[in-house]
Amino acid sequence: MKKIIFMGTPSYATCILKALVENENFKLVALFTQPDKAVGRKQILTPSDTKAFLSQNYPSIPIFTPSSLKDENIMRQIKDLNPDFIVVAAYGKILPKAILDLAPCVNLHASLLPKYRGASPIQSAILNKDEKSGVCTMLMEEGLDTGAILESLECDIKDKNSSEVFELLANLAAKLILSTLLNFDKITPKKQEESLATLCRKIKKEDGLINLQNARELYQKYLAFTPWPGVFLENGLKFLELELVDELKQNAKMGEILELEKESFLLACKQGVLRIKKLQESGKKALDGRTYLNGKRLKSEDSLC
């Protein structure tokens, strides 16, 4: 039975953690995750998704939430656990070389490397209109997502939002990590092709700011930034549900309401047309498109904003 230290934080990582802890070939000896964070208006201290899952279902397995992995006591604790593998999935911290040298460190990255190294591979793939994505296991080294690839699985992501793709890739990653660890000695690591490498940065709230220039680009932003940070106009109006109706039509009036429907309306971008199904003003409740227009006394040929 191989001893595993798992390092991960969000729900994506929990799916992988669950697969490992339930498999009879592995023994989870510890979880490393981010410290509890203050959440919401009341700033309630909340554990990470992985910590909540493990403490509720497997309370005997130790959980560590260090602010730094460079602490000598943390290094010693990891060494004393004597892991056969260290598995990392969306942990949120860089592993120092001293830890990388203790055991094979296998990272699960939510892209088909070397594309989209970095913090937002799923959102970046959607923004770039990729129809395929996937997950891969790689041997970690000091560079950011630069290690040799062990195995990968791909899937279709066309017209899926980030939330849906996260769930899809989490389930793929849970299968992939079992395959990689069980067959580790038989796998020949494959060096990444540096000429094909692309980088992606962390998503910020302001990335959700949109204009009505291009319907296709707005639609891809909507998919990429659901559920967070969402998409919103400069006046704070959020588009919660929308569909791409036409991506080529040139419209004379950007922001014109083209047609009212039962629970939605068609909106003109400078190029293309969107169906707005649900929207929300800042500080107010969400409304379907038609109800919102009725409340604002807006009709066909009026400007939304």
Curated annotation (Swiss-Prot):
Catalyzed reactions per annotation: L-methionyl-tRNA(fMet) + (6R)-10-formyltetrahydrofolate = N-formyl-L-methionyl-tRNA(fMet) + (6S)-5,6,7,8-tetrahydrofolate + H(+)
EC number: 2.1.2.9
Main enzyme class: transferase
Protein family (similarity comment): Belongs to the Fmt family.
Function: Attaches a formyl group to the free amino group of methionyl-tRNA(fMet). The formyl group appears to play a dual role in the initiator identity of N-formylmethionyl-tRNA by promoting its recognition by IF2 and preventing the misappropriation of this tRNA by the elongation apparatus.
HAMAP family: Formyl_trans
Protein name: Methionyl-tRNA formyltransferase
Protein species of origin: Campylobacter jejuni subsp. doylei (strain ATCC BAA-1458 / RM4099 / 269.97)
Recorded name of the encoding gene: fmt
